[in-house]
Regions:
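Hydrophobic core of alpha-helical transmembrane segments in multi-pass integral membrane proteins
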Residues: 38, 82-94, 123-131, 305-324
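C-terminal membrane module of polytopic membrane proteins
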Residues: 281-332
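Juxtamembrane helix-loop-helix connectors linking adjacent transmembrane helices
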Residues: 57-67, 71, 101-177, 187-227, ...
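Hydrophobic residues within alpha-helical transmembrane segments
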Residues: 238-242, 278, 282
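Residues that define the loop-to-transmembrane-helix transition and helix capping
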Residues: 233, 251, 271-274
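Alpha-helical transmembrane segments in multi-pass membrane proteins
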Residues: 37-98, 147-148, 306
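Short, charged juxtamembrane terminal tails flanking transmembrane helices
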Residues: 3-9, 211, 323-332
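Short, Lys/Arg-rich, polar N-terminal cytosolic tail immediately upstream
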Residues: 1-23
Length: 332
């Protein structure tokens, strides 16, 4: 089970044996690259922040010490950071994609399947946001210090501003940038860290026919790889953990880790990064109106609210699973 199996082979059909030291070296190399991607993201945000603050210097200097940036400078910072991150990490992912594990799981989505997939992801997004809100309402009162910190954060203009540009930055630019970074770049590098047998996959030089499915490798490789479930979940946990840590606080980090696992599974199931982006978009956008769904809570009570959440998640997962089921395959 622990080895990377070829689609048409058994566990005994393995390539070169890789020593323990080689495995450790491979894992260290690719995990260092994943951490490097996170550091690059931090550096980009820092550079954009300095540039935006320089442009709005007069307005920023008028803000009392200790207070957060608000108004136009904040919105400009959110938009500029989102665009910069999206351009850099979408570009990096497009470079990695032809030689990626995800590319080998990709299947064609006609318009009908894409519409059903989007509908399923919308249900999941609303259900996940409702579930997070309900769980936090139960858990946060037990930890007053974390509750106060989180309430202050969510009450800040970053999340409460409903201007179009601000909502676009949170609901569109952030999902594109974060999914390209974590479920694209970091997830791919994490898979390489735990699957050293697949080196021919990322060493080959893809031709212009790559996206049409015709592979021309300079390094021989099996026509298809099947990553075992333990290795997938190990790589998925790595990217989700880094996703949670990047959020910078315990409460957001905890549910970002859980969401990262879901986003990773969604992309892996479909073999397409846009599925994770759309789900992330649905989760973030529903943040702005999930409070309005409290009418369900008042009308039906806790049980009714929970039933509504379970129904949304169950319908979303079932529909998405049906849309992305591969013929003759029972794997996730």
């Amino acid at each position: 089970m622990g080895e990377l199996d070829m689609e048409n082979g058994s566990e005994g059909q393995r390539g070169e044996r890789i020593s323990l030291f080689a495995r450790i070296g491979n894992a260290a190399t690719w995990l260092a690259a994943a951490l490097g991607a996170i550091m690059l993201d931090s550096a980009l945000c820092r550079a954009v922040s300095l540039a935006v603050l320089a442009v709005f210097r007069a307005q920023v200097e008028a803000i009392p010490a200790g207070q957060m940036i608000t108004g136009t400078p904040l919105v400009a910072l959110m938009a500029a950071a989102g665009v910069t991150e999206a351009v850099v990490f979408v570009g990096w992912w497009l470079y990695l994609r032809p030689r990626s594990f995800l590319m080998r799981r990709a299947s064609r989505f006609d318009m009908r399947r894409a519409v059903f997939a989007a509908g399923a992801l919308a249900l999941l997004g609303v259900g996940l946001q409702m579930a997070i809100s309900l769980l936090l309402s139960w858990i946060l009162p037990l930890f007053p210090s974390y509750s106060a910190e989180y309430s202050e954060l969510m009450g800040s203009e970053y999340f409460s501003n409903t201007e179009l540009l601000s909502m676009t930055a949170v609901s569109v630019l952030a999902p594109i940038a974060e999914e390209a970074l974590f479920r694209g770049v970091v997830f791919e590098l994490s898979l390489r860290a735990v699957c050293p047998e697949a080196r021919p996959l990322w060493h080959r030089r893809p031709s212009h026919d790559e996206l049409s499915g015709e592979l021309h490798d300079t390094h021989p490789a099996p026509p298809s790889f099947s990553v075992s479930a333990p290795r997938f979940w190990c790589a998925n946990a790595i990217q989700a953990l880094l996703f949670g840590v990047l959020h910078g606080n315990v409460v957001q980090g905890a549910y970002a880790f859980a969401l990262g696992l879901v986003f990773g599974w969604i992309d892996w199931r479909a073999g397409k990064l846009w599925c994770g982006i759309f789900l992330h978009f649905a989760v973030n956008l529903s943040l702005y109106f999930v409070a309005n769904l409290a009418v369900i809570y008042r009308a039906w009570g806790t049980l009714g609210y929970v039933v509504c959440i379970v129904a949304l998640l169950a319908c979303g997962f079932e529909l998405f699973s049906r849309v992305t089921t591969r013929r003759g395959s029972t794997s996730a």
